[in-house]
Each structure stands twice: as structure tokens, then as C-alpha cells.
């Protein structure tokens, strides 16, 4: 692998601009060679002057790159030093908890697990040290990659120009640079390993390193997993084509609406899951750090192939169940046993309490889902409102769940539906507005909670108003459908016009918010990226234009649906079954740009690891910190109001903000 590819594969995405610009420097070298005057056509002195001028420009560029790297490394090293001091202080406090101070120090310093320390405190310390260690490894990787980059490019310089100026410049400047000579990062890593081994894991280094280990950057996927994804995906495609052909020629029987509603929700879930896997692949390939954005464990999380594997396996099961439903009579099995079996398997997989089948990922999903349902009572993180947005694209699945509960609760036999199907259709129509509003309510409640925590009316109250418009759309649609007997013609029904007006307003509101707020497009400083933003992650600008147009079309797809249904060309259930997968696809495209926008926010803050707080923090503290971070120099200016000893205290603080000296440990600095 060439170094340029190695660098691209191993950089920390949030620090991308702070690395050596290896490609630009290599392009400068090749351009200089191509544009150099020919020694056969001009005097040798002119060639010498040309390369001397180029070397001046090239090494000036190297100076700028070196200064950039030194500055960033020093800032991150100082940040790591302060962070370790804080963690070490919390650990010392926890170690002394529950022991009288009169005891000797060696008796007080026993492992956390054997002391009277709250389990939550121990867990927070373990997580904080683990995340801090990851940040140290990323910084060490930054140090090594940049030194290797300078060594490679200067060696290439000497080889192409047949000189040794690059080697001498490396010796005089790079090998004497602060980012290379400073070894505090190695000492911090060693002291962190020692603290976790001795004070948290009771001297068990193997267990400590298992907790701290960082997965190899650019780790390859298991060939066995790749094989299974290909096998089950191919099988699903074949079976899906078979299902379509069988449905066209044999149909779903007399109660086709019941069959359609039974299999629609699982298909949407499977489609959504598979497209999430494609999302993860796209994010990873483009350098969007979804692991950080969702605050996943960087040492243990599902890859795109793991997600696709689960989706493709359930896709095969879904197709087999549909075929069993269609051919129930020749097979001699109860017709409605197939959908019940499908739902049972999916529920058993999700709720399986054993530590099998990606248990950590499943428990994470369940925990986030509970937080979504409890939206007004929980602090809202990115994963919470992202999942709630996904649920807003799966309203038909929500509508089918009450039907299933009613159907299997009333049906005396699994062979034939009887009157249960028609009764449950009427039953669901009464619950329709309540169930349809639920996903929008979850996001509405989250926005209100975020406003309560941050006291910022924009964007949170404005975003809440966007979801509130969905309430009116559902209510007016329900009133229209319940008054069709009173008003035989739609144009005579006043609720029809209320419904249309609310739907148009809601769609325009949602589309504008998608493009401007969620995706950050139509930036006035977009420059060459017309109608987009100044910085884009994905390689093709046409992908962004496709997303803008596709989102507009699918946001207003209800107009086509309403026209065809009102004209009597198609049944409502059939139209919903066709449009529901398209809405999931719209959300799939939306996910790319939403996470890109969040990723660029992290890049602006150089945030590459999770911010784990060990000390308890209430919402007011968190709100204050968020506001200070949003303000220019907000954290530095927070002491300006203090009159007594202001200047001397500032001077003292500046003296204390230093890196470790050679031979000095973190504990010496904190003591």
C-alpha cells in the first residue's frame, strides 16, 4: 500500500485538516519536475536557479505544515494532560472513599471493586479511562503518521531532484520539532495503563488491557461474515422475485388486506435495517465517524456487514413466511401461522436476554428506544432523536401493530380469518389518528425537552412546531374520512380542504428544515459547491443534488397517492404498501447528509472521542458548558467578572498551563 493510501485509511477524520498535506506536497514535486526547463535547451545555471527557487517555496510550505502540526499537537497534549489530572483526581477520591484517613496509604489503595464505591462511579471511571486512552492512542498515531509523512515526502524530494537537502532539512527541523521530540504521550499512555491495572482492575494487566485495547485502524471484515452476507442477500433476492410472481398469479386470498398488513411492517423493518448497513458502509468509506456521533463503543460495535447479515437473514425468513402464507393449502399448514411465526422470531431475536446474537447492540437499541418513548423525561442525545426520526418514516408499521394484536386476539383459528379481519379494520380505523401521531409526538417531546435544557427557542421550539404540523395533518385526515357519508363528494367536504392545506404546509416546512437545518445546505458561503455548503464530505456533488430533488419528490408523494385513491384507480392499502418502502429509502438518503452535517460540527471542534464526565453533572451545569463552548472564547472569558486578584490569577493560570517537563510525571504535576 502506498503511503498516501495508508495515510487516508489511518487518519482521525475529525483531525483531517491538521495532518501533513502529503498529496499536495507530492503534487508540488511532480509539477516541478514536469515544468522544469530541459538541460539540453537551456544553460545549466538556469536549471539550477529554477530548482533553487522551487526548493525555497517547497521548504517554506514544509515550514508551514510543521508549524501547524506542532501547534495542534501541543494543544491536544495540553488538553490530555488536564484531562488525565482530572481523571486521576476522581480516581484518588474514589480509592479513598469509605476508608478512614488515619489508615496507611497502602491499606487505603485497594482495587475499586473491593471497596465501598458505588457501582455507577466504578463504571463511569472505567468508561472515562477507556475513552481517554483511545484519545491518547489517536494522538500517538497522529504523531507517528506525520513524522512518517515528512520522512517519505523529503525522501521523495531528494530522489526526484538528486539532492540531499530533504534529508538535511528533516534532521534540522522535523527531528528537532516539538511534536516528535516530546515523549509525554508515551508517558501518559504508560501511566494510564498502570492506573487502570493497579487501581481499577486490581493488578490484572490482561483484564486492564482488554478494556483499554484499541482495535487496529482499518481492520478488515471477517471473510466468513462477507460470505454469509452474500449468501443470504442472494437468497433473499431470488425469494423476493418468487414472492412477487406468486402474489401476481395466486394472490393473498380473499382477505388480502389482512395478509398485506401482516407482512408489511416486518418488510419495512428489514429494509430499514439493510439500508442502515449501507449507510454505515458509506459513512466509513467517506470518513464520517458514525461511531463517535452515536457514541458507540469504538472497541465493540457492529460493522456494516454485521447489520446487513441480520437484515438478509430475516429477509429470507420473511420471504419464506410469505410463500408459506400464499401456498398454505398445498402445504397443509395454517395460513396465519406463518406471520405469527415471523413476528415471534423477530421479537425473540430483539428481546433475547442471553449474551448471544450481538447482545450489546440489541440492548443498546432497546435502551435508545425506551429513551425515545420516555422523551420528555430524559436528556436527549443524538442517537435518541436520530432513532425517533427513523420511526417517523415507519408510520405504516405502527399502524399495522394494533391490527395484528386485534386479529390474533380475536381469531379462533389460524386457518381462516373469519370476521376477525373486517372487525379489526374498523377497530384500527378508530385508533389510526392516535397511532399515526405517536412518532411525531416523540420528536415533538424531544424538542420541548431540549428547549427546557438549553433555553434556546431556536432551533428547538421551531423544530417542535414542524412536528406539531403533523398532528393537524392526521387530525384533519381522520375528520375527512369519518365524514365521507355526510359529504359524498370530496369537494363538498370542508375537512378535505383543511387536510390538503395542512399537508402542503407540513411538507414545505419539513422539506425546508431537511435541506437548510438538518443537512446544512444552501449555505451563502458555499463557493464552488453551488447551493450546497463550503465543505462537503462525499466525493460527488451530484449526490447532493440528487438528494435535494429526491427529498422534494418523496416529501410530496402523498399528492400522487391522494389523487389516485380519490380517482378510484388504486386501493389505499396498496398505495400505502408501495409508498412506505420509498419513504424508508428517502430516510436512507437523509441519513447520509444528516450525519455528514453532524460530523462537520465535530471536525470544527476537533472532537474525536466521546466526552465522558465522571463527576455528577446536572442539566444546568451541562447547559452552561454547552453555551460557553458555543461562544467565542467563552470558556476563557468566564472569569472576567472577578475583580479581586483578576490579573494575578490569570497570570498564575497561564503559568500552570504547561506541558510535562522531561522526566516529570503527571502525578508530580497534579500534586
UniProtKB/Swiss-Prot annotation:
Please give the residue ranges for the topological domain Extracellular.
254-255, 329-334, 414-415, 489-491
Tissue specificity of this protein: Detected in PXo bodies found in the enterocytes and progenitors of the midgut and in the hindgut, but rarely occur in the Malpighian tubules, crop, brain, muscles and germlines (at protein level).
Localization:
Membrane
Cite the entry's keywords alphabetically. Answer: Membrane, Phosphate transport, Transmembrane, Transmembrane helix, Transport
Which residue intervals are topologically Cytoplasmic?
1-228, 288-300, 375-379, 456, 520-538, 610-671
Question: In this UniProt entry, which residues are annotated as the site Gating residue for phosphate transport?
Answer: 558
Report the transmembrane regions from the record: 229-253, 256-287, 301-328, 335-356, 380-413, 416-455, 457-488, 492-519, 539-570, 571-609
Provide the membrane topology annotation.
Answer: Multi-pass membrane protein
Major localization class? membrane
Q: What is known of its domains?
A: The SPX domain plays a role in the regulation of phosphate flux. Inositol hexakisphosphate (Ins6P) is bound between two SPX domains of the homodimer. The SPX domain has high affinity for inositol polyphosphates and its affinity for inorganic phosphate is two to three orders of magnitude lower.
Subunit structure as annotated in this protein's UniProt entry: Homodimer. Interacts with the FAR/SIN/STRIPAK complex members Cka and Pp2A-29B.
Q: What is this protein called?
A: Solute carrier family 53 member 1
**Lineage of the species this protein comes from:** Eukaryota, Metazoa, Ecdysozoa, Arthropoda, Hexapoda
Amino acid at each position: 500500500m502506498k503511503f498516501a493510501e495508508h495515510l487516508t485509511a489511518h487518519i482521525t477524520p475529525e483531525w483531517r485538516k491538521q495532518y501533513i498535506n502529503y498529496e499536495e506536497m507530492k503534487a508540488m514535486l511532480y509539477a516541478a519536475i514536469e515544468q522544469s526547463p530541459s538541460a539540453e535547451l537551456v544553460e545549466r545555471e538556469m536549471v539550477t536557479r529554477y530548482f533553487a527557487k522551487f526548493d525555497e517555496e517547497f521548504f517554506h510550505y514544509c515550514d508551514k505544515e510543521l508549524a501547524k502540526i506542532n501547534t495542534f499537537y501541543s494543544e491536544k497534549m495540553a488538553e490530555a494532560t488536564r484531562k488525565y489530572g482530572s481523571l486521576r483526581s476522581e480516581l484518588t477520591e474514589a480509592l479513598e472513599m469509605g476508608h478512614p484517613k488515619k489508615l496507611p496509604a497502602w491499606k487505603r489503595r485497594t482495587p475499586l471493586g473491593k471497596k465501598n464505591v458505588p457501582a455507577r462511579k466504578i463504571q463511569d471511571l472505567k468508561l472515562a479511562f477507556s475513552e481517554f486512552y483511545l484519545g491518547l492512542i489517536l494522538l500517538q498515531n497522529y504523531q507517528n503518521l506525520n513524522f512518517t509523512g515528512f520522512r517519505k515526502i523529503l525522501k521523495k524530494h531528494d530522489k526526484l531532484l538528486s539532492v540531499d537537502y530533504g534529508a538535511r532539512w528533516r534532521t534540522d527541523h522535523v527531528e528537532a520539532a516539538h511534536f516528535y521530540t516530546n515523549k509525554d504521550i508515551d508517558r501518559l499512555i504508560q501511566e494510564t495503563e498502570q492506573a487502570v491495572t493497579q487501581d481499577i482492575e486490581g493488578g490484572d494487566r490482561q483484564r486492564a488491557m482488554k478494556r483499554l485495547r484499541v482495535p487496529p485502524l482499518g481492520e478488515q471484515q471477517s471473510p466468513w461474515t462477507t460470505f454469509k452476507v452474500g449468501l443470504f442477500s442472494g437468497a433473499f433476492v431470488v425469494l423476493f422475485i418468487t414472492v412477487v410472481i406468486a402474489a401476481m398469479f395466486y394472490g393473498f386470498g380473499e382477505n388480502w388486506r389482512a395478509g398485506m398488513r401482516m407482512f408489511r411492517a416486518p418488510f419495512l423493518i428489514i429494509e430499514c435495517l439493510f439500508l442502515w448497513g449501507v449507510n454505515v458502509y458509506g459513512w466509513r468509506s467517506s470518513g464520517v465517524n458514525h461511531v463517535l456521533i452515536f457514541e458507540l463503543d469504538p472497541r465493540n460495535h457492529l460493522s456494516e456487514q454485521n447489520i446487513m447479515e441480520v437484515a438478509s437473514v430475516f429477509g429470507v425468513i420473511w420471504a419464506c413466511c410469505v410463500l408459506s402464507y400464499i401456498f398454505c393449502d398445498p402445504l397443509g399448514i395454517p395460513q396465519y401461522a406463518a406471520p405469527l411465526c415471523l413476528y415471534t422470531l423477530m421479537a425473540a431475536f430483539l428481546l433475547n436476554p442471553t449474551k448471544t446474537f450481538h447482545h450489546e447492540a440489541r440492548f443498546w437499541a432497546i435502551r435508545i428506544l425506551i429513551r425515545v418513548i420516555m422523551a420528555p423525561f430524559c436528556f436527549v442525545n443524538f442517537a435518541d432523536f436520530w432513532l425517533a426520526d427513523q420511526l417517523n418514516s415507519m408510520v405504516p408499521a405502527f399502524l399495522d401493530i394494533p391490527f395484528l394484536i386485534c386479529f390474533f386476539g380475536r381469531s379462533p383459528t389460524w386457518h381462516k380469518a373469519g370476521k376477525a379481519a373486517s372487525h379489526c379494520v374498523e377497530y384500527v380505523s378508530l385508533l389510526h389518528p392516535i397511532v399515526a401521531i405517536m412518532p411525531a409526538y416523540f420528536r415533538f417531546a424531544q424538542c420541548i425537552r431540549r428547549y427546557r435544557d438549553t433555553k434556546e427557542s431556536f432551533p428547538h421550539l421551531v423544530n417542535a412546531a414542524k412536528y406539531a404540523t403533523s398532528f393537524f395533518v392526521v387530525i384533519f385526515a381522520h375528520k375527512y374520512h369519518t365524514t365521507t357519508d355526510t359529504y359524498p363528494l370530496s369537494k363538498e367536504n370542508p375537512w378535505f380542504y383543511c387536510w390538503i392545506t395542512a399537508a402542503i404546509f407540513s411538507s414545505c416546512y419539513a422539506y425546508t428544515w431537511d435541506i437548510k437545518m438538518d443537512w446544512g445546505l444552501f449555505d451563502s458561503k458555499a463557493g464552488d459547491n453551488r447551493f450546497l455548503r463550503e465543505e462537503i464530505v462525499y466525493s460527488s456533488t451530484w449526490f447532493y443534488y440528487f438528494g435535494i430533488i429526491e427529498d422534494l419528490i418523496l416529501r410530496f408523494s402523498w399528492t400522487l397517492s391522494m389523487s389516485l385513491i380519490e380517482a378510484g384507480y388504486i386501493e389505499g392499502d396498496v398505495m400505502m404498501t408501495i409508498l412506505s418502502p420509498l419513504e424508508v429509502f428517502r430516510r436512507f438518503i437523509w441519513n447520509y447528509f444528516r450525519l455528514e452535517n453532524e460530523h462537520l460540527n465535530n471536525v470544527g471542534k476537533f472532537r474525536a472521542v466521546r466526552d465522558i464526565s465522571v463527576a455528577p453533572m446536572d442539566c444546568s451545569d451541562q447547559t452552561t458548558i454547552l453555551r460557553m463552548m458555543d461562544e467565542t472564547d467563552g470558556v476563557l472569558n468566564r472569569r472576567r467578572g472577578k475583580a479581586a486578584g483578576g490579573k494575578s490569577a490569570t497570570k498564575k493560570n497561564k503559568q500552570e498551563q504547561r506541558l510535562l517537563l522531561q522526566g516529570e510525571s503527571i502525578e508530580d504535576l497534579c500534586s
